[in-house]
């Protein structure tokens, strides 16, 4: 018999194809913006922990890059390897799928999670867009056939629909453990990392479909001076033309990027922010394994 009052703690991997709502789901569960989001695929590049402690239960969510096909650069290999590694050594796996469409990349992820031996939950996202819920039944039945050991829960990550039910199922699957992190800690990532991600998010929201994947952000200075947090961020691109696009006509685009990033940073860090942005050309960085490691992309 399970002790419902036991202290529980464990790791929960959130996996799925790009742009399916994984980071939105994490942010809604945590009740604050931690993972960056955009409408463009492959927004998330690194695994990041989002930690939620509620009473005796501590769930440590692993937000992962979207598993994707195509893209032969070292950066693409890194993201796929990072996402696949998250399936190992976790206590629960959440496979997020979009009810509105099924792609080859969804199928690729499904074929990988079929080998998960621990608890597997399929979070059927964007069900708020379906007026007649009976339309969900064929898809639910098909998913259950493909993943007979999975528990399928319809949700809306954007609207927060049915997330309480999802979290209840997750908590029931977590092992009895002492908590691994202090109850007020929400992530394993540094403030410098979060600041860089916020700048990159604003770039992705400002620019076209291809350019954001050839951009990364490095924080060169992160210093509290009195009541103001001073942050200097370096935006790396691969070509001179990309630098001009980011700066924009008379510097208008980079000014908008900085203004939007600063507002989110002030909310996240609860401090006045002085943000300075620079753009630098570093040719071929996204396919240079040594450069990627120096930029914090780990083992490739």
From Swiss-Prot:
G4, as annotated region: 125-128
GO cellular component terms, A-Z: cytosol; plasma membrane
UniProt-annotated stretches for the region G5: 155-157
Binding-site list for GTP: 16-23, 63-67, 125-128
Segments forming domain KH type-2: 199-283
Domain Era-type G as annotated: residue spans: 8-176
PROSITE patterns: G_ERA, KH_TYPE_2
Compartments, record wording: Cytoplasm; Cell inner membrane
GO molecular function annotations of the record: GTP binding; GTPase activity; ribosomal small subunit binding; small ribosomal subunit rRNA binding
Membrane topology: Peripheral membrane protein
Segments of this protein annotated with the region G2: 42-46
Region (G3): 63-66
Assembly and interaction partners: Monomer.
Similarity comment: family membership: Belongs to the TRAFAC class TrmE-Era-EngA-EngB-Septin-like GTPase superfamily. Era GTPase family.
Protein name in the entry: GTPase Era
Organism: Pseudomonas fluorescens (strain Pf0-1)
